Every structure is written in C-alpha cells, then in structure tokens.
C-alpha cells in the first residue's frame, strides 16, 4: 500500500482532522485497533457459541504464574514443569483416614489440569521441553505454608507429566530455579456436556468440521469425578512409595544415568584370507567403550568410578546424585583402562581393553584326555580286589620305584631337535635350533645328573609340533637349569658341580642316547695367520664324534662345536683318546684332499710350472751351498724331458742398461722375477724382466730364454682413446642417426683417399730422402731415438708429432714436381677447399698416428 499513490482531497483531510480532535472518536478508534491486533477474545466467543450449538459448555483456562520445577527428561534433555494456578480448576479436598500402618491422617484429593508440551530454549539457547500443570489457587497457598503439602504438589505434577506424556523424569535431581513461569502462557479449553444437549438439533456439517466427541461416561458418575478419584488414588500410592524409599536410611535415592556399551574391534587383512586361524576370535572385541550420559554434571571431580574385571561402578553425590552398577559382557584389563569426560555433551566415556583368553591347543586337549581317564576309573562304585601275594624282596622294589623319578608323559609323535653346545667352565649352553617356540609349553625336568625338556612350537602350517630333548652327564651333577626363549632358537643353560666334563649323552629320551665328547684343550696355539693366540681362555674346536659301539671315526659322524675356557696358569694335558681321534680325523681329511688333487686334470702350463718351481729351488740351494759359485752356474739351459718346449718372451731390449748397476743386483734379478704371476692365467708363471730395464750385462743364459719363450708370444694393448656417443635433448634420434651415418661415410672416403695418396707418395719420399742434404745432416742421437721409438712403438719426445708433421709437409713440397698430374689436381682441389679445413684434416691424421704410437704394449712370458 505504501508503494501506491495516496490520493486524498482537501475536504477529506479537513474532516479527519476535525474528528481526531474529538476525544470520543479517539477512544472508539483505539478500541478498534486493539481488536484487530489481538482477536483472542473474539476467537473465544465464537468458539463458545459453536460448541454450545453441539451441546457442550466450553471454558478457557488461562494459567497464572506459580513456581517452576527443573528436571531431566528421559535422561537426555532438560525439562521445565510450570506449577501454575487457575480459578476454573476445582479446589483440593481432604478426608480423614488410616494409613497402611494404622496411623490416622488426611487423604487429599487435588484436581489439576494440563496443557500440551511445547518446545522452548534455556539461557544457553539449548532446546528444552515445557509442561504446564494448573491447580486451584488455594492449593498453591497451602503449598507455600506447609512443606509436606508442597512435596505432595510436586509429586502430583511429576506423576501427571509421566502418565500423560509417557516420559521418564529424574526425581532425584530436582532443581527449583527462581522463576514463576517458563515461557509464554497459553490458554487451554475445558469442555463439559450440557444437560439438554440431546434435544438440540444436530448439524452434520459441524460434526465433520470439528473433532469427534469423547465417549459418554457411565450413568450416575460424571467423567470429571471418576478421573479425579483415579488420579488421586494413583498419586497417593505413588507418593507413599516414594516417601518410603526416601525415608529408608540404608537405601538412599539415586538416579541411574543413561548409558550404552560399544564393542570396538580392529579389522585386519589376515582375517580376509582362507587360513585356518583367520577367523579365530573374530567375534571377541578388542576393547569396550561405556558411554554414560550425565547431563547435570559439569565435571567428574566428585564422581567415584571403580572398574573390576567384570563390573563397573559409578557413584556421584554432588552436584547430582547418580549411581550406576553395570556388569560387563567380557573380562577387561582394569589397570589399562582410561576415562574421558566431554563437557559439551555432558558424557563420560570409559575405554576398557578386553582380556583375551589363550586359545586351546592340541596339548590342552591331550592333557584333558589324560586327566579324564583316571576320573572314569574312579567313577566305578565297586571294584573287585583279588588276593595278591607279594614276592620276596617286594619292599625293596617298591622303595626303588618310589625313589626313582617318574618321567613325564610324552606325546606319541615327537621330534629330536638339532642342537649345538657351548662350554664355559662348569656352564654348558645347549642351543636348540627350533623357531617359534611357545613359552607356555616349555617343561624342564631337573634330575640329579640329567635334564629332560619338552616343548612345542607352531609350524609352517599353523600346526603344533612337539619336541623332546634329553641330556645326561655321567661324571657330574646338575646344580641349576635355566632357559631362554628366542625367535629362532631355545637356549638351555645347565650349571654343573665340576668343570672337568669330557663327554655327555643326548637323545630323545634316556633309553636312546648318543655319547658326545668335549675337547678340553687345543694343542696348537698358532692361528691361521701364523700369530700366537694371546688370550686362549675361549677355545673353539670342531670334533667328529663316534658312537659307543665303534671306536673308529666314521664319515657320517655328528659334528659339534665346543667352546672351552682355559686356565691362565698352566695348560691342562689333552686326553690321549681325544688326541688320537683328532689325529685320525686330520689324517682322513688330508687323504680326501690328496685324492681330490690326484683326480684333478692338470694342464700343460700347470705341469710346467712345477718344473720351474723345482728349478728355482735348486738354484736357491746352490747359491746357499757355495757362495763362490759363478753366475754361469744359474744360466744353464733348461732341459725338460717330460714336458715339451714352451714359448716364453725373451729379455726385452727396449731400454739400455745402466752402467751404475752392479753385478750383484743383476745376478739377483732373474730369481726375483720368477715370483710374478700372469694376468691371463690362474696358474703362476715366471714373468720376464720389465721392458723398461735392460739385462744385457746380466748372466742369464740366452739359450734358456729361447728354449722356453720364443715360440709363443702374447701381446696386450691398452688404448687410451674413449669412444663417446652423445645425444642432444632437443633433437630427434633419427636425425642424429642420419648425421652420424653421413659423417661416417665422409670419414671413410677421406681414409680411402689418404691411403691411396700414401701409397703413391712412399716412393717419392724415399727419393727425396736420398737427395735431400738437410735430412742427411740430422744428428746421431735423433736417429737412435727414432730407432727406439720404431722398435717399441712408444714416443719419448713430446714434440715428435709436430716434427713428423713438418717432415711430411716438406716431403710433399719436394715431391710435388715429380708427381703426376692427378696428384697435383688433388692437391689443388684440397687447397681450394680452404687452408683451414686442410690443416684440420692433416692434424687429425697425424693425431691418430700419435695416438697409435702412445698405445701401451705388454708382452707376457708363458
């Protein structure tokens, strides 16, 4: 309306102004506005007229403030009960009577009226539920004067809410805030049937529009009276029961809080397989979570929580009275539990890990069967006992049987484990090589001179395997036995009364044992490196043992490692029997080694090396025997009738001998060079003297070198040049391949052209060399150097490459006139291509020749 233009004439404006000046008009206008704003009264009048046409008298109950009760609804949310008053509710009445115990008292009948619950919010903007219970003003007046009547009024209000709306209220933790009314008051309707309602005409239209009427009560009693009496009776009974429970001192009134138990379990990948033990204990949770809702507590400082294996107890006195006694579905570890309190949700969470029981194994079943068999025998009520005549000496036999220790029963299928033993003074440690040993199944039977052990483990197929181990010491007594479980083995430590134990017996039981001896001393104190053992307190010996029946050492005897500790002062004498057995074992091993050597096929080089070694030994012996022998005695030719003549490299002539070297040093060099080994063969060969030193003045026979090494010669070359293949990241591989092929073709053509030019220029260079005076005037020292380089292939002058390039250029210049026209044309075409490119090609060619000369050549004598 504000968006439209408001058109008013001058006369209309003058009339409105004149009317507003009149006070009577203003009052009428205000009354009209009030009716438009609040039409509750009009609604009530119209509804009363409508119900009167149907035969009912309608009254509207408007609650007046009284006081408020605060409690908890269903253990979750807050609830407020408005105990208010209304004139339309009947007055409370009382009659005299007797209680159950015979005492006189008053029986009160307190009528009340209720409205439907509505949702509201508290000070923290948390949603809550509000209920209205209306009494007569006289009832509230009596409650303000009498504390007992006030309590009766509170119990009546709580009972009315619980019965009408099917909720559970917390009676133990009631609060009375300083409020007269919670929320906004709302009126309710009280409908009563008129006496002459049957004579009124019925209108079907009203019956369809309005809700159905309640059932007609029985004649003689009105509905209000019957309902009031029933409620009063229930209220009195409930009030008496509550008062009796509160009055009993031994059972104080507590509220049981809301709780829930959550079973938690981790899902593992192993449970998704088809293994036999994949689904074991799947239904048993890992932990239990008990969530307790405590809406009236801000903290758990005043709470007392007690947890056992099977129960949970919670008690709270202030600020709210809570008590919870809970029986847990599984046994828990009470010492490992933890509790947390959520302030926002007002809940206490108690986490308790579940105590898992050990799984039943096959051994438990066997033991149960064994224990059940004597129980069956004992179950017989009557047994026939015959007359038994004891033989002579029966008492002694019974005494022996009683004194002898009874061996524990062993399962039928057992395994004797592999073991090793370590000895230190009087302590023996037996290591049983068994994996995954179950510690709960280890049983040790400690006897006077023996130890019997039984245990089991879980095999690869998750099936238990049973092991037995029995050890006896004939000449010693067992004082203490201990065991240690590891992932890979089981260690049994046995302490004896003496350290002088030479042997022991071991086996699956006392009837099937094998004797094992312990080596107490090591005769040789020299280790494999040729050094004396400084601390020989711990000596390790490997001995092959034999059985009792055979005295000889067998090839399949058991192998054991014994560690013994020696005394610092004095060495104990070795047992003769042990020494003989060790000597026999060494002899047997040596015989086997020799037989393997005989069966091995030897090459010709191996056999010839043996002859060379014999020659070296003979030469060494002759030098020691006679100091005045000449050098020619070691230079005799080698004649080998059994072996063929083998080729070896002669002494190198690449380096001249030094005059300063003495004859003694030269005489010892042939002997020293025989200890070098070849890099091409596994067998040891005599290597020739280094190529860098000369042996012209040595006394070694040339005939020996020729007879051994001039027939076979092997050369090893090591080239310093490295071939590289480079690929660019921003180019195609196929393009680079084509370029490489093209460069390779150009290089091949250049090499072919260079080779053809070299053949034609060889003769010209020779003629130019004969006619050139400058080249003939070169020094003798330079000729010797060139000769050495040509012979060995190694250039000793760093500028030799440059000199060769200059000589080649001069030879080409001199022989240019004697060449044919074809040679001159090729030369001119090369010059036209550019001096820079020709120089590069020539330099590359000479560089290749220099690189070839710098290669290293090694000659190896065989």
Swiss-Prot record:
Cytoplasm in keyword set: yes
InterPro entries attached to this UniProt entry: Kintoun, PIH1/Kintoun_subfamily, PIH1_N, PIH1D1/2/3_CS-like
Compositionally biased intervals (Basic residues): 587-601
Subcellular location, principal: cytoplasm
HAMAP family referenced in this protein's UniProt entry, alphabetically: Kintoun (MF_03069)
Function as written in the Swiss-Prot or TrEMBL entry: Required for cytoplasmic pre-assembly of axonemal dyneins, thereby playing a central role in motility in cilia and flagella. Involved in pre-assembly of dynein arm complexes in the cytoplasm before intraflagellar transport loads them for the ciliary compartment.
Bias (Basic and acidic residues): 564-586, 748-757, 766-785
Family: Belongs to the PIH1 family. Kintoun subfamily.
Region (Disordered): 208-229, 564-602, 626-670, 743-854
GO BP: axonemal dynein complex assembly; cilium-dependent cell motility
GO CC annotations on file: cytoplasm
The protein, known as: Protein kintoun
Key words of the record: Cytoplasm
Location(s), subcellular: Cytoplasm
């Amino acid at each position: 309306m504000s968006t439209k233009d408001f058109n008013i004439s001058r006369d209309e404006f003058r009339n409105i102004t004149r009317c507003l000046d009149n006070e009577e008009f203003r009052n009428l206008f205000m009354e009209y506005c009030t009716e438009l704003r609040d039409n509750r009264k009009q609604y009530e009048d119209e509804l009363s007229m409508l119900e009167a046409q149907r035969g009912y008298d309608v009254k509207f109950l408007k609650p007046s403030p009284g006081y408020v009760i605060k409690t908890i609804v269903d253990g979750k949310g807050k609830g407020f009960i408005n105990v208010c008053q209304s004139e339309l509710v009947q007055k409370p009445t009382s009659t005299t009577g007797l209680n159950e115990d015979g005492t006189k008292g008053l029986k009160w009948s307190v009528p009340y009226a209720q409205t439907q619950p509505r949702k509201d919010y508290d000070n923290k903007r948390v949603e809550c539920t509000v209920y209205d219970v209306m009494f007569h003003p006289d009832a509230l007046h009596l409650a303000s004067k009498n504390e007992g009547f006030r309590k009766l009024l509170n119990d009546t209000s709580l009972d009315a809410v619980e019965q009408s709306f099917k909720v559970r209220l917390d009676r133990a933790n009631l609060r009375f805030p300083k409020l007269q009314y919670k929320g906004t008051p709302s009126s309710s309707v009280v409908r009563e049937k008129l006496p002459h309602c049957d004579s009124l005409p019925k209108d079907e239209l009203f019956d369809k529009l309005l809700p159905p009427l309640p059932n007609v009560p029985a004649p003689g009693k009105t509905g209000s009276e019957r309902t009031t009496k029933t409620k009063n009776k229930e209220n009195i009974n409930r009030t008496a029961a509550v008062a009796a429970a509160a009055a009993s001192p031994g059972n104080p009134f507590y509220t049981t809080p809301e709780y829930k138990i959550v079973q938690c379990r981790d899902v593992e990948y192993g449970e998704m397989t088809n293994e036999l033990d994949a689904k074991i204990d799947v239904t048993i949770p890992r932990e239990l979570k008990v969530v307790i809702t405590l809406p009236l507590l801000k903290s758990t400082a005043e709470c007392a929580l007690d947890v056992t294996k099977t129960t949970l107890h919670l008690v709270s006195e202030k600020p709210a009275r809570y008590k919870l006694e809970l029986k847990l579905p599984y046994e828990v570890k009470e010492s490992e539990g933890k509790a947390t309190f959520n302030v926002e949700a007002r809940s206490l969470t108690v986490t308790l890990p579940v105590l898992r029981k050990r799984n039943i194994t096959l051994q438990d079943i066997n033991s149960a069967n064994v224990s059940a068999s004597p129980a069956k025998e004992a179950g017989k009520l009557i047994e026939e006992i015959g007359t038994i005549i004891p033989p002579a000496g029966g008492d002694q036999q019974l005494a022996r049987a009683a004194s002898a220790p009874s061996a524990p029963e062993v399962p039928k299928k057992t395994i004797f484990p592999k073991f090793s033993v370590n000895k230190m003074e009087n302590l023996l440690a037996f290591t049983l090589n068994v994996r995954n040993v179950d510690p709960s199944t280890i049983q040790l039977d400690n006897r006077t001179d023996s130890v019997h052990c039984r245990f089991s483990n879980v095999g690869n197929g998750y099936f238990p395997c049973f092991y037995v181990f029995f050890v006896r010491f004939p000449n010693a007594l067992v004082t203490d036995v201990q065991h240690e479980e590891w992932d890979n083995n089981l260690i049994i430590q046995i302490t004896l009364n003496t350290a002088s134990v030479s042997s022991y017996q071991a086996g699956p039981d006392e009837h099937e044992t094998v004797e094992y001896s312990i080596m107490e001393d090591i005769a040789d104190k020299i280790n494999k490196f040729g050094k004396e053992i400084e601390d020989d307190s711990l000596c390790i010996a490997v001995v092959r043992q034999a059985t009792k029946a055979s005295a000889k050492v067998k090839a399949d005897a058991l192998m054991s490692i014994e560690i013994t500790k020696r005394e610092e002062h004095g060495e104990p004498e070795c047992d003769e029997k042990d020494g003989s057995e060790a000597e026999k074992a060494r002899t047997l091993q040596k015989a086997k080694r020799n037989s393997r050597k005989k069966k091995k096929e030897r090459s010709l080089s191996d056999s010839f090396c043996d002859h060379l070694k014999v020659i070296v030994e003979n030469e060494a012996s002759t030098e020691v025997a006679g100091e005045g022998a000449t050098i020619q005695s070691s230079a005799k030719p080698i004649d080998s009738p059994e072996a063929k003549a083998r080729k070896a490299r002669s002494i190198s002539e690449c380096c001249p001998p030094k005059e300063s070297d003495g004859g003694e040093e030269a005489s010892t060099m042939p002997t020293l060079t025989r200890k070098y080994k070849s890099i091409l063969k596994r067998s040891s060969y005599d290597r020739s003297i280094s190529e860098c030193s000369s042996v012209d003045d040595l006394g070694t026979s040339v005939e020996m070198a020729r007879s051994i090494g001039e027939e076979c010669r092997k050369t090893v070359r090591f080239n310093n040049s490295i071939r590289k293949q480079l690929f660019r990241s921003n180019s195609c591989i196929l393009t680079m391949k084509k370029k490489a092929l093209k460069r390779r073709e150009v290089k091949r053509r250049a090499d072919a052209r260079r080779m053809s030019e070299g053949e034609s220029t060889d003769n010209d260079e020779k003629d130019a060399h004969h006619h050139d005076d400058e080249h003939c005037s070169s020094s003798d020292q330079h000729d010797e150097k060139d000769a050495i380089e040509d012979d060995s292939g190694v250039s000793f002058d760093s500028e030799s490459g440059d000199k060769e390039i200059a000589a080649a250029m001069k030879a080409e210049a001199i022989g240019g006139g004697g060449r044919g026209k074809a040679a001159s044309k090729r030369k001119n075409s090369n010059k036209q291509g550019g001096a820079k490119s020709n120089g590069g090609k020539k330099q590359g060619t000479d560089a290749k020749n220099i690189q070839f000369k710098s290669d290293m050549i090694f000659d190896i004598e065989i």
